[in-house]
């Protein structure tokens, strides 16, 4: 065991709601951490790129490819 296991256990046991909610008492913490991660991925820019711009670019590329595929398929069906 690591030397931190005792302090981690004390911290987890001191988190309120253990009797009523059990392990589900940590859900608000995970929601907040997830929201913070999402916020940072959208708003923080590394160099010239951030996650949001990259995602939108990939989404637009996939949409264009799908439309081209559908148009090619329609052209083949009419021949």
Swiss-Prot record:
Entry annotated with the keyword Mitochondrion: yes
Transmembrane segments: 21-43
Major subcellular site: mitochondrion
GO molecular function: protein-containing complex binding
Topological domains, Mitochondrial intermembrane: 44-79
Topology term for the membrane: Single-pass membrane protein
One Pfam family, short name: UPF0640
Keywords for this protein: Membrane, Mitochondrion, Mitochondrion inner membrane, Transmembrane, Transmembrane helix
Any Gene Ontology CC annotation: mitochondrial inner membrane
Role, per record: Required for the assembly and stability of the mitochondrial ubiquinol-cytochrome c reductase complex (complex III (CIII) or cytochrome b-c1 complex), a multisubunit transmembrane complex that is part of the mitochondrial electron transport chain (ETC) which drives oxidative phosphorylation.
Miscellaneous remark of the record: Expressed from one of two small open reading frames (smORFs) encoded by a bicistronic transcript. The ORF for sloth1 has a non-canonical Kozak sequence while the ORF for sloth2 has a classical optimal Kozak sequence. Both ORFs are expressed because ribosomes occasionally fail to initiate translation of sloth1 and continue scanning to initiate translation of sloth2, a process known as 'leaky scanning'.
Name of the protein described by the UniProt record: Ubiquinol-cytochrome c reductase complex assembly factor 5
Organism: Drosophila melanogaster
């Amino acid at each position: 065991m690591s030397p931190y296991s005792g302090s981690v256990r004390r911290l987890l046991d001191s988190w309120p709601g253990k009797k009523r909610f059990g392990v589900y008492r940590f859900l608000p913490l995970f929601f907040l951490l997830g929201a913070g991660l999402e916020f940072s991925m959208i708003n923080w820019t590394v160099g010239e790129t951030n996650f949001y711009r990259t995602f939108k670019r990939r989404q637009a590329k996939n949409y264009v490819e799908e439309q081209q595929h559908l148009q090619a398929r329609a052209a083949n069906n009419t021949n």
